[in-house]
């Protein structure tokens, strides 16, 4: 199971990460706040303002697609193991503040009929953070919050994971999922 968790450094350059954070902060009217049972963060869904985010949606969907191809190659996954048709979940940016409150406690990303079509997670860290990592507690593994790096893994129950609290500065990630259609 741990072999299906992959991290790719330098998927985005520092300037692209900074630009995404700046634009996220510029459009506060698009922010959605979540605070429910240990799940605390602020999110922006690019699809809800697709004209403002059109360039980013196109650019980063291509990067996610290329990363998916690399993941399949690196893991020697054959075409018969993947769906021939799939779709991307809208790209979101999430911010976790260093306030001893924002975090995403252990969970899985497929836990209902609504989320059951997800089959692969993509997280790009937009900021460096000495904490705020993604942990896989049952697998005794974690991914550092390293600016520009991409974390990919299946979203189902064997990959219980958590986004730990950032300590000194905000943590930003850009994420999407691949879905069965």
Mark where each language-model region is.
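Fe(II)/2-oxoglutarate oxygenase catalytic core
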Residues: 1-150, 158-181
């Amino acid at each position: 199971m741990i072999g299906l968790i992959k991290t790719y450094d330098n998927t985005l350059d520092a300037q692209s990460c900074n630009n995404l954070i700046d634009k996220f902060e510029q459009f506060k009217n698009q922010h959605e706040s979540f605070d429910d049972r240990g799940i605390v963060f602020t999110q922006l869904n690019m699809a809800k303002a697709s004209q403002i985010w059109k360039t980013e949606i196109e650019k980063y969907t291509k990067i996610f697609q290329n990363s998916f191809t690399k993941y399949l190659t690196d893991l020697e996954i054959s075409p018969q193991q993947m769906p021939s048709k799939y779709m991307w979940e809208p790209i979101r940016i999430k911010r976790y503040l260093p306030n001893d409150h924002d975090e995403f406690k252990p969970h899985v990303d497929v836990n209902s009929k609504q989320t059951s079509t997800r089959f692969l997670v993509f997280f790009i860290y937009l900021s460096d953070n000495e904490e705020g990592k993604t942990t896989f507690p049952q697998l005794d593994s974690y991914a550092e919050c390293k600016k520009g790096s991409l974390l990919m893994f299946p979203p189902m129950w064997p990959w219980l994971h958590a986004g730990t609290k950032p300590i000194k500065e905000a943590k930003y990630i850009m994420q999407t999922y691949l879905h069965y259609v």
